[in-house]
Amino acid sequence: MFALLASLASCAYYLQHEEKSFLSWMRSTNQFYTGDEYQTRFGIFLANQRLVKEHNAANKKFTVALNKFAAYTPAEYKALLGFRMDLKKRVAVKSTKKANAESLDWRDKGVVNGIKDQAQCGSCWAFSTVQAIESADAISTGTLQSFSEQNLVDCVTSCFGCNGGLMTEAFQYVIDNQNGQWCLESDYVYKAVDGICQFSKYSHVGSISKYVNVNEGDEDDLAAKCEQYGPVAVAIDASNWSFQLYHGGIYDESSCSPSNLDHGVGCVGYGSEDGTKYWIVRNSWGTSWGEKGYIRMIWKNNQCGIASMATLPFA
């Protein structure tokens, strides 16, 4: 009887301690729940807390943390992953060059904007497209501007706004229907919901004339084209919980698929640490996720499909 009471007391203490952690997490992420939803979110939080502790105790190349997605339902997380697979054959010409630099970071060259946040909208494809065009335009003109993701969410008829899309479709739409031009983010503000196309309402800037694909699955080609032309719009498999809760280090996830791609991001360079090569990948989940909004993904066997569907625009 005494043992049972001691066990119950220990369990109660554990839950009380963990609930304090959950309440602290809610305050830090500005996410508040009550009633039945509170209990549901608390359960998800506890499950992810166990995963985080087990993973970090294993001393892997990267760490995970209880970030703002730590109490997300699977459906909520999946809604962020808005890249829609394109089964059409892609045309790519392999670069005749190899990357010369041992490391490359386009952020150091003043042609990459700060991290943005797509919020609870599956518009990653629009953010992936825009970051590549912003950098291409900056490399061409010497002026870095912030272009409108909402322009794409509202206007690209071959994509589905907050329900997903393709970067190549967005590039083609801008070339065919907007004369390669763009609206500024300050004019056409991001709202994280689908709306009516208002491209004609605002003044237009920038210009892209074409885009080129990276040879499918070829990381050497990705490096060469990134060095030659600038940041790349890439699709990856981000479905794993370890990506959702990524905190820092070189992301090396053996269960990551090179072909089941679901998330649009940007590749702004590459480097190495202690002999391990990695890609510098820009996400659109705000600066509280990962390494101030970035993730370093291992350069090995096209893990997570980093080079499977990668595209670069030309200004």
Question: Where in this protein do the model-derived segments appear?
Answer:
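Catalytic-core signature of thiol
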Residues: 7-315
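Classical eukaryotic N-terminal signal peptides for Sec-dependent ER targeting/secretion
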Residues: 1-7
